[in-house]
Amino acid sequence: MAGTDREKALDAALAQIERQFGKGAVMRLGERPNEPIEVIPTGSTALDVALGVGGLPRGRVVEVYGPESSGKTTLTLHAVANAQKAGGQVAFVDAEHALDPEYAKKLGVDIDNLILSQPDNGEQALEIVDMLVRSGALDLIVIDSVAALVPRAEIEGEMGDSHVGLQARLMSQALRKITSALNQSKTTAIFINQLREKIGVMFGSPETTTGGRALKFYASVRLDIRRIETLKDGTDAVGNRTRVKVVKNKVAPPFKQAEFDILYGQGISREGGLIDMGVENGFVRKAGAWYTYEGDQLGQGKENARNFLKDNPDLANEIEKKIKEKLGVGVRPEEPTAEPGADAAVTSAAAATDDTAKTVSAPAAKTTKSKAAAAKS
């Protein structure tokens, strides 16, 4: 009898909450629709796989941090380009006042439709972010960078004044306000951050990020990006080998790593990453300096194989699909008119896999191979 009374009381409370706050304000977890995680591809197949869901999750906070010139902005601009190619609206809050539109254009960003803000101080920047997110019209918003979100009091004060904790409090308040709106509008917020060193640390890493601890807690994904090697063509440096570690991930298992090439003036080499992952997963065969795919030679040396895939985007897409299907992450939907190196639309991992099964047929694969052979000859 007591149990029945408790159930009636709970049902009455739930009904009252729904009347007061609206339908869906409270529900049993099993009644909530289990929607697949929608993502924005990063431009690197290896990183999409390391993230576990095929890209950066929609409606979440993402932090990208690392040393100077490690590729933070480049990685973010690739995500911007991919969101735009899917028909999404993107805003870029350039607090550093350092965005190069020509470089962004080379990476595939539609600069004519990119919403840009270059705020005067941190409060103004985060107020703009809050208003844009609450509009519900954005798919992605980028803040570059957290370190440049200088509080108004610091800008208006004297050079030697101490402003302890101002930026941390500002970030904490802003994240409290925008996190819920991000989830409701399915907008991804990417915060680019810089590294600092703690003084007097004897054990462990002295490195830390700016802006206090709030961003570490609110971020669903945190990416640590580092330059590990300089790529050279003879004696000339042509790019960097980059490693990204997923140090926090709320949507898949964390602590996975991805490596890819960033070429100067071109950005992330998608084709180079496909060759590396193709060899690793057995789809591309390497014999000496030659790379082959299903009996067809891609080229002698990685650079020639990379150029061949760039000239044959259908073949590159086919290799990418096979890699992602094998590893069980989101697959790029087929785009017949896609340009070389063009990246995927924003898709969910599960839906994309189903779409691929429907769109890829044996005749299409044969046509691709015949094109590859013709291009070789």
Swiss-Prot record:
UniProt similarity note: Belongs to the RecA family.
Low complexity composition-biased segments: 342-377
InterPro entries named in the record: AAA+_ATPase, DNA_recomb/repair_RecA, DNA_recomb/repair_RecA_CS, P-loop_NTPase, RecA-like_C, RecA-like_N, RecA_ATP-bd, RecA_C_sf
GO BP field: DNA recombination; DNA repair; SOS response
Main subcellular location of this protein, as a coarse class: cytoplasm
Domain of life: Bacteria
Nucleotide-binding in keyword set: yes
GO molecular function: ATP binding; ATP hydrolysis activity; ATP-dependent DNA damage sensor activity; damaged DNA binding; single-stranded DNA binding
Function description: Can catalyze the hydrolysis of ATP in the presence of single-stranded DNA, the ATP-dependent uptake of single-stranded DNA by duplex DNA, and the ATP-dependent hybridization of homologous single-stranded DNAs. It interacts with LexA causing its activation and leading to its autocatalytic cleavage.
Subcellular location: Cytoplasm
Name this polypeptide is given: Protein RecA
Native organism: Streptomyces avermitilis (strain ATCC 31267 / DSM 46492 / JCM 5070 / NBRC 14893 / NCIMB 12804 / NRRL 8165 / MA-4680)
Keywords associated with the record: ATP-binding, Cytoplasm, DNA damage, DNA recombination, DNA repair, DNA-binding, Nucleotide-binding, SOS response
Gene that specifies this protein: recA
Region annotated Disordered, chain positions: 329-377
Pfam families: RecA (PF00154), RecA_C (PF21096)
Binding site for ATP: 66-73
PROSITE patterns with a match to the protein in the record: RECA_1, RECA_2, RECA_3
GO cellular component: cytosol
